[in-house]
A protein has these predicted regions:
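Residues on the lipid-exposed face of transmembrane beta-strands in outer-membrane beta-barrel proteins
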Residues: 53-57, 91-95, 188-194
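Surface-exposed loop/interface segments of Gram-negative outer-membrane beta-barrel transport/assembly proteins
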Residues: 1-33, 77-82, 88-185, 203-220
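Outer-membrane beta-barrel channels and translocator barrels
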Residues: 48, 60-62, 96-98, 195-197
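A generic beta-sheet turn/junction motif
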Residues: 57-63, 72
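Short strand-turn segments of transmembrane beta-barrel domains in outer membranes
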Residues: 1, 23-54, 69-79
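Short coil/turn segments at secondary-structure junctions
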Residues: 39, 173-177, 192
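Short beta-strand-initiation
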Residues: 48-50, 88, 187
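Repeated loop/turn-to-beta-strand initiation elements of outer-membrane beta-barrel proteins
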Residues: 61-66, 100-103, 199-202
Length: 220
């Protein structure tokens, strides 16, 4: 065994003059020096669920037809706090009118939402940014990532094995920080055709492409 990383932490020894819960709890504690499965236990098995529904129909004479499509994608990434959700709705139709006019149109609406814990380049020392992946992979094998407390009780901040607490605990990142993006988009086309005769027609087309994107980054 070796001295517990929180018991020998210069950061905890100095924080509030050493009068803090973790310093008092782990000072003098011993820590089993052995390999831990920190990387394997931090990540999880991902999953993907895809659902689709289609409805279509037409009149007996074939002059009117329609179709409706709905799709749902729910993806859970192998990194905790990472996921993607998407909903799509498409509607289309065509009507051949008795006065030589034909109207047809389609509309597609999609909503996509993506979330992820902080990701950045990493040197394992916090100087290039805040990287959940980097902080996991730079964790030594003899440090039990999943067995160490990750929150400082007094202020809710991150605590990790480094003597100076100079990188963010990946478990704290997942619980307290997130980046995300939500995108809404609408595409639609409409056309109106007038047939003068079998060889001549006039068509008017209108298209719309509307896009809205919102990004968020937060940390407690």
């Amino acid at each position: 065994t070796v001295e517990h990383p929180y018991g020998s932490s210069a950061f905890l020894n100095a924080f509030l003059g050493g009068n803090n819960v973790l310093n008092q709890q782990y000072t003098g504690e011993r820590y089993v020096w052995q390999p831990y499965r920190s990387v394997e236990n931090f990540f999880r098995s991902g999953s993907v669920s895809n659902t689709s529904l289609n409805i279509r129909g037409a009149s007996e004479d074939g002059k009117i037809s329609y179709n409706v499509n709905y799709g749902n994608l729910d993806e859970e990434g192998f990194t905790p706090g990472n996921g993607l959700k998407r909903n799509n709705l498409s509607v289309g139709g065509r009507a051949q009118l008795s006065n030589k006019f034909t109207v047809q149109g389609s509309m597609n609406y999609s909503n996509t939402s993506f979330v992820s814990p902080p990701v950045a380049a990493s040197r394992g020392n916090g100087t290039l940014g805040w990287s959940t992946f980097g902080n996991v992979f730079f964790t030594p094998r003899n440090v039990d990532l999943m067995g160490l407390p990750y929150t400082i009780p007094e202020n809710g901040g991150s605590i990790y094995y480094r003597n100076g607490n100079d990188i963010i605990n990946p478990n704290w990142s997942v619980a307290n920080a997130q980046g995300g993006q939500t995108v809404n988009r609408i595409n639609s086309t409409t056309s109106l055709t007038y047939e003068f005769n079998d060889n001549l027609s006039l068509t008017y087309r209108y298209g719309l492409d509307w896009y809205n994107e919102r990004n968020k980054e937060y940390s407690n």
